[in-house]
Amino acid sequence: MKPFFVFKCFLTVLLLSSCKTKSLLPGPLLAGWNGKKVCEKIEDNKHQRILKCTFKPDEGHERHYHLPHFGYTLEGSTFKIKDTTGTRIVNVKTGSYFDNNGIEWHEVINIGDSTAVFLIIEPK
């Protein structure tokens, strides 16, 4: 009986150590704003997924997470961004870009007077 107990303990440790946590939040493609989609998939292949996200004034992106990605601003505006560090106002300029190793969660709203458009490039 003792070898079986040791095997059960080993199996339990192995299974627990291989568990990956997954966010309960939607990713950027599934997250929308007031029931409306704000991102569309424009490319999805074995190397990358590219999203185009459009935010009219007073539209935003409900709380969601991001995997590592690169972003490029096709059309900028001013955003109120809320995340794990708090809330801030950011003036996002056309042609600006950013990259990160993922975002646990954030939510944004376009508080500017112009439509903003972003490309989000997620490597696979």
Tell me what each language-model feature is.
Residues 1-5:
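Positively charged n-region of N-terminal signal peptides that target proteins for export
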Residues 76, 103-124:
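Ligand-binding loop in jelly-roll beta-barrel domains
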Residues 66-85:
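Glycine- and acidic-residue-biased ligand/ion/polar-headgroup-sensing regions
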Residues 20-26:
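Bacterial lipoprotein signal-peptidase II cleavage site
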Residues 15-18:
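C-terminal motif of bacterial Sec signal peptides marking the signal peptidase cleavage site
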